[in-house]
Amino acid sequence: MNAEQREYIGIINQSAEEVILIKKTGWEEVNLPGHAHGKCQIIYTLAGTLHVEIGSESYFVPEKHIAWIPGGAEHKLSSNSQQVSMAIFYVNLEPLGENDPKGEFAIYTANALIGENLKFIASKGKVIEKEKQPDLYNFTLGFFNLLPQMSPGKELLLKSLVIPND
């Protein structure tokens, strides 16, 4: 992990509970080793394919899909030397019980409504603070809380397969 990545993870971990952080990438290669942070990480792949590793499992997040990584989950991100463009959101979302999908890793399809809302939220800067932008903060928090129900269906998790040579 390079110094810039360590610094940003520190910013995430030190940010207040009522702050939503937003990071947009251009076309870039992703190679982030295993890490965890207290906020839920919601990654919208605008273009390209992202690989997410959680524990011993590896998943593909194709273009126009969302990776939902719960807070505290150890994960690795990579693009296997390919370039990817993403909008990444870090937000405090506490699961409401064992069966709440907010507490589990998931991949969701982004239909037009979801995609446009994510782009709108991402266009509002790098930080949304409840104290300074209460309406935008409440909209964003409500949107992310409803996202698992709004998605056309939780995708089958696209796992990497090991194919034998024989």
Question: Residues of each region from the PLM?
Answer:
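Generic protein-terminus/edge-of-domain signal
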Residues: 1-53, 59
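Short beta->alpha connector loops
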Residues: 50, 72-73
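Short acidic-glycine-tyrosine-enriched beta hairpin
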Residues: 56-71
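Generic detection of short hydrophobic beta-strand segments and adjacent strand-loop junctions
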Residues: 59-61, 106-109
